Amino acid sequence: MKKKIILTLMLGICLPIVAQQVDEINLKEVEVKAARFVLKPDGRLIFPSDAQKNASTSGFSLINKLALPGIRVDETLRTVTSIRQEGTVQLRINGIIATKEELLSMEPKAVKSIHFIDQPGIRYGTDVAFVIDIRVQKAANGYVLGFDGVNSVTTYNGDNSFYYNANHNNSEIGVTYDFGYNDFRGERTDEAARYELVDGSLYTVQRNDETARNRYFGHCIQLKYNLADSASYVFQTRLSTAFSRMPDNNSVCQITTPTQSYKAFSEQKDKDFTPILDLYFFRDLGKHQSVTANMVGTFIRTDLESSYNEGAPYAYSVAGNSYSLIGEAIYENRLKPFLLSLGFNGSLKYTRNSYQKDVSLTDNLHHESVYCFAEIKGKLFGANYTADIGVSNQRYRQDENRYNYWLWRPKLTLSYPFLKVFNVKYGFEMSEHMSQMANISRAEIRQNSMEWTVGNPELRPYKRTSHTFSLDFEQPRISSGIKMEYRINSNCSMDKYVRTADNRFLYSKTNQQNINMLYVNNYTRWDMVPEKLSVMVFGGIYRFFNQGDDYRHYHTSYNYGANVQAYLNQWTIMGYADNGWEFIEGEHLNRNHSTIYLSVSYRVGAFEIGLFCQHPFRKNPIMNSSKVLNRYLNKETFYRNSSFGNMISLNFAWKFTKGRQYKQMQRTMNNKDTDTGILK
């Protein structure tokens, strides 16, 4: 009777988090063995084929071969992004957020399954579009030593990783080192701007880069110790230190106005130092109960110098320090009719950024957050459900500016399988979003002779409400899905342009009416020759509604693409192409232009050699473009980079293992901080 009362109360309120160890309760999901995945309320559980695992050298390589809908993988730059830029793609290994080094050093053959979540709840953080959780077996004994490097032969760009992991009984130690670099000299920005001045006249400016150089060097070393008995406890500590440097990024720009033509010079130097300590603990309490805790401490040191000379010198420097502490605890009880989860997440952050020279001020930003939640998950009347209730609080103060923002956050996901090949799903969520810390700075940064970027200390968090509906069709060799979502961002952070009496154009962010989006998309995958040749195509239509205090902007865009994969013994051949992604947010119309990736790799024993080509047959591709649609300022900008045109990179991977034996492992946490709060 007590369990029935709990179930009734939770379903009556229906509010948020996300699944923990979702495969530990029998929901009688739709399973299609030949298709190697199981549909779940929040996504799907994928079982990679032996051909996919054998042809992969790292986590990035394996994710790329899965051809996940809405996901773009760049094996050269070691990035996984959302095609539609809905938010970040969160990568995990056994439930814990994974670093790039861990994804490179993981052994694809030890992968049991991959949980692809396309409706992540707030349990995974804010602005997360997808979660990819790779579940691997933990090695009981032996060691692995390896190297994975991608280096371009047509430009100065690369990323190289060395790793070592050793296991003995319940203990594991790991060391990884990563070095990345680039020196791009083919970047060019072309900009045409039209300003309406106070007297009603129009003033036009053409800005065209003549030369530009962008250099980056990054080092990261990570130490990890893990002590685990998969039946009762897990303890893990991870210490990492990252150091990056941009020694001298500069450009020379030709500026043309109705009365004169002259050159402008810009230069920027940047150094970052980021140590992170991550502690994780899991304990099985018995009687289907468990508790999980995680704590992450981060320090970010930033030194930035920027200068711009457009007839008169302008320069500023920033010395920034950011301290943050994030803690989380979750209690789970696997009751017979449902899985109950109760949790708490809290964070403390202090940021001090001191601006010098032409910008003279010090930002002292204090931010605290608390989030409490409860979740149940089970099966009722043939439908799988996940129902959540939670409340969050965000607090911020900076001198006399402060806010105290509370929000109830409900989330409900229902899915129903029928006719053995179909699954229909509905999701509702109310979540909280906040702008980057840099946007609430008190700084005012000059961009050129006409424009300034201004922080807004009065910016507040805002509420997002989303409704999603999807229908999936699954057969042994073909799968297809259609998804529709309507997203409402109320009183959200939107663009604000102000024209001053002396004809300066100030850009900032303010809370305004709403930004809404409606879209419908589809993906279809066909295994033409099982485990040998597969094709995936996707497409969608998107409608955007932007309603500011003094403007209205609407836009419709289309997105489509395809992915082809072929496995021929030791050879793997892949091709990917899409038409890019266009969206409007506030008064900016942005477009990421079309992309083509081609790759071929050959594997023999512990070695693999691969060849990657980006933007083939394009000498100087447009990477992205944007338009400013303000009534006083109209501007169109194109960013090109010839370094990426016909870009060819070589991948060499070597992995040596000895005495590796595996046992299954499951973990469930994610916390980190990367926001410096610096306005640029």
Model region roles, listed by residue range:
Residues 324-326, 456, 460, 466, ...:
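Outer membrane beta-barrel strand-and-loop segments of large Gram-negative receptors
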Residues 403, 422, 432-481, 508-518, ...:
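Outer-membrane beta-barrel signature, preferentially recognizing the C-terminal barrel domain
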Residues 60-96:
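Extracytoplasmic beta-strand/coil segments of soluble accessory domains associated
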Residues 29, 59-64, 78-81, 101, ...:
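N-terminal periplasmic accessory domains that precede
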Residues 20-52, 61, 76-77:
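Short, acidic, small-residue-rich periplasmic hinge/interaction motif at the N-terminus
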Residues 149-153, 168, 179-183, 241-245, ...:
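Transmembrane beta-strands of outer-membrane beta-barrel pores
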Residues 94-122, 162:
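Short acidic/polar hinge/loop motifs at secondary-structure boundaries
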Residues 218-246, 266-401, 405-410, 417-420, ...:
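Face-selective signature of the C-terminal outer-membrane beta-barrel domain
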